[in-house]
C-alpha cells in the first residue's frame, strides 16, 4: 500500500425532491383542496474520521462522491423521503481545503469527528403550501433545489507528539524501532525511509506517546529537493523534536546547521519547536573523540547534546528520561496540551505507515 498524504476530490450533495400538485379525491369530497406533498431534502456529504485509516490512498481511485437525491412529494400531503447522506471516511489528521478559494474548512483530528462539506438541497414545496384565502386550489408546486457541489483538497498531517528528524542515514529508523515496536525498513544507504513511520512509546507512568520518524531531509528540502517539503508538513503537529545527528559524519555541526536552516526556511514555527539534540552511532567513536565532539557541539549550539547508539541500545534511558521531562514541562506550560493547529474551524456546520506499541 502506498503512503498518500494529499488528494483532490469532488463532492456533490443530493438534489431536493420536487413538490407535487395533487388534490384530495375522496368518495364524499369530489372537489377537495390541495394535497400535494413537499419533496424530501437531498442527502449531504460528510467527512468522518476513522482512526484505523492511515493514508489518503483510496481517494486516488475514487474522486467523485455523491449523496442521494431526495424523493418527490406524494399525494395526501406526503413528504418525499430524504436522500441518504454520503459519509466519507478519512484518517485522523486530515486537513480539508476548498480547492477554489483555498480556505481551510476543517482540521479533523479526533476519532469519529465529522465535517459537513456539501449540504443537500431543500425539497420543493407541494401545492398544499400555497393554499390561501385568495387561492383555494393552487395548481403549481416548486422543484427541489440543487445540492451543494465543491472541489476539496485533502492534506494529511500525521498526529505525533515527538518527531525524529535528521539527515539521511542519521539512524532515525533504527531509533524508532528500538524505542517502539515499529518495524520500518532499515538499510545503510540514504533515503531508506521513503514514508513516515509511527511508533508508540509508553512512559513509566502515563499513556503512550506517538513518535514519528520523518524521512531524511537534505539542504533545499523546503524547496522540494530530496524528499522535499511533502514530509516537512508532518512535523507541524509535533510538540517536541529529536534532532538526530550521525556522529561519524564528516562534519556533524554542519549537518545540524543544515537541518536547522531547512526548518527555519519552511516556517510554521518549526525552528522554534523544542528540540533535543542527539549524537547517534557513538559505538563507532573512541571515548576521547566522543567527548571532544560533544563538547564542541554544545559550545556552538548552546544546548545539551545527548550521546546514544541506537543499534547498541546505549544512552537510551537518559534520552527517554529527558523526553518525558520535556513533554511534562510542555504540559505544564499550556492549559491545552493538544497538537498545535488542531481543532475544528469555527462557523462550519497514506506504503503503509508502520505502527508499534511498546510497554
UniProtKB/Swiss-Prot annotation:
Function, in words: An essential GTPase which binds GTP, GDP and possibly (p)ppGpp with moderate affinity, with high nucleotide exchange rates and a fairly low GTP hydrolysis rate. Plays a role in control of the cell cycle, stress response, ribosome biogenesis and in those bacteria that undergo differentiation, in morphogenesis control.
Molecular function terms, GO-annotated: GTP binding; GTPase activity; magnesium ion binding
Localization: Cytoplasm
Entries under Pfam families matching the protein: GTP1_OBG, MMR_HSR1
Gene: obg
Assigned EC number: 3.6.5.-
Entries under InterPro entries matching the protein: G_OBG, GTP-bd, GTP-bd_Obg/CgtA, GTP1_OBG_dom, GTP1_OBG_dom_sf, OBG_GTPase, P-loop_NTPase
Cofactor: Mg(2+)
Protein name: GTPase Obg
Enzyme class (EC, first level): hydrolase
Organism for this UniProt entry: Cyanothece sp. (strain PCC 7425 / ATCC 29141)
Self-association and partners: Monomer.
Residues that, per the record, bind Mg(2+): 173, 193
Domain Obg stretches: 1-159
Assigned protein family: Belongs to the TRAFAC class OBG-HflX-like GTPase superfamily. OBG GTPase family.
Amino acid at each position: 500500500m502506498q503512503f498518500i498524504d494529499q488528494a483532490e476530490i469532488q463532492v456533490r450533495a443530493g438534489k431536493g425532491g420536487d413538490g407535487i400538485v395533487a388534490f384530495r379525491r375522496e368518495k364524499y369530497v369530489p372537489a377537495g383542496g390541495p394535497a400535494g406533498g413537499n419533496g424530501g431534502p437531498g442527502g449531504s456529504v460528510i467527512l468522518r474520521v476513522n482512526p484505523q485509516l492511515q493514508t489518503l490512498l483510496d481517494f486516488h481511485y475514487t474522486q467523485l462522491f455523491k449523496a442521494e437525491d431526495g424523493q418527490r412529494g406524494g399525494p395526501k400531503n406526503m413528504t418525499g423521503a430524504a436522500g441518504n447522506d454520503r459519509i466519507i471516511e478519512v484518517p485522523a489528521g486530515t486537513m480539508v481545503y476548498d480547492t477554489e478559494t483555498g480556505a481551510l474548512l476543517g482540521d479533523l483530528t479526533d476519532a469519529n469527528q465529522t465535517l459537513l462539506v456539501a449540504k443537500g438541497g431543500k425539497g420543493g414545496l407541494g401545492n398544499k403550501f400555497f393554499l390561501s384565502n385568495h387561492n383555494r386550489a393552487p395548481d403549481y408546486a416548486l422543484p427541489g433545489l440543487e445540492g451543494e457541489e465543491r472541489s476539496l483538497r485533502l492534506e494529511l498531517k500525521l498526529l505525533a507528539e515527538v518527531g525524529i528528524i535528521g539527515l539521511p542515514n542519521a539512524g532515525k529508523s533504527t531509533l524508532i524501532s528500538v524505542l517502539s515496536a515499529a518495524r520500518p525498513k532499515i538499510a545503510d544507504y540514504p533515503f531508506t525511509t521513503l514514508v513516515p513511520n509511527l511508533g508508540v512509546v509508553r512512559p513509566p507512568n502515563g499513556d503512550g506517546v506517538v513518535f514519528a520518524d520523518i524521512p531524511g531531509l537534505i539542504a533545499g528540502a523546503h524547496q522540494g529537493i530530496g524528499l522535499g517539503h511533502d514530509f516537512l508538513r508532518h512535523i507541524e503537529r509535533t510538540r517536541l523534536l529529536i534532532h538526530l545527528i550521525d556522529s561519524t559524519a564528516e562534519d556533524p555541526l554542519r549537518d545540524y546547521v543544515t537541518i536547522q536552516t531547512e526548518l527555519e526556511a519552511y516556517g510554521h514555527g518549526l525552528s522554534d519547536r523544542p528540540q533535543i539534540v542527539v549524537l547517534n552511532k557513538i559505538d563507532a567513536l573512541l571515548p576521547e573523540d566522543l567527548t571532544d565532539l560533544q563538547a564542541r557541539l554544545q559550545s556552538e549550539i548552546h544546548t545539551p547534546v545527548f550521546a546514544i547508539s541506537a543499534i547498541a541500545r546505549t544512552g537510551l534511558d537518559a534520552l527517554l528520561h529527558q523526553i518525558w521531562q520535556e513533554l511534562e514541562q510542555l504540559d505544564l506550560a499550556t492549559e491545552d496540551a493538544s497538537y498545535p493547529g488542531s481543532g475544528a474551524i469555527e462557523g462550519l456546520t497514506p506504503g503503509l505507515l508502520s505502527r508499534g506499541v511498546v510497554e
